[in-house]
A protein has these predicted regions:
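Short capping segments at the starts of secondary-structure elements
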Residues: 25-28, 35-41
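Two-component histidine kinase catalytic core, primarily the HATPase_c
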Residues: 26, 53, 84
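Beta-hairpin "wing" of winged helix-turn-helix
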Residues: 63-73, 79
Length: 103
């Protein structure tokens, strides 16, 4: 059985939710990984974390509209909704990632 995930429509992605999702260092690191790759197995986003912790953080990113999750067999593949974020909030993701890279 393939699991389906709820994702907000692009029009429903809000700045406060996106900023909240990006405010956590763990989720920010996940987004940095996703920004470099097309899709990542969810377990590769937090190999040293309990699965429940990875699930918690990926759920917050997905519900905020930052990521898209798709199920394929026993794996969950996560991808960054870059086009949605860049359209709704031009420059936001690049600024956040650049600021984090400067640390």
């Amino acid at each position: 059985m393939v699991r389906s995930y709820e994702h907000p429509e692009a029009k429903d992605v809000s700045l406060p939710r996106v900023l909240f999702a990006l405010s956590d260092p763990v989720r920010l690191e996940m987004v940095r990984i996703l920004a470099r790759r097309e899709a990542v197995n969810s377990l590769d986003l937090g190999p040293d974390m309990p699965k429940s912790t990875v699930t918690h953080h990926t759920r917050i990113l997905r519900e905020a509209g930052v990521t898209r999750t798709r199920s394929q067999g026993r794996n969950c593949w996560i991808s960054l909704r870059r086009e949605v974020l860049d359209t709704k909030f031009p420059g936001l993701l690049d600024a956040v990632l650049a600021a984090e890279a400067d640390r």
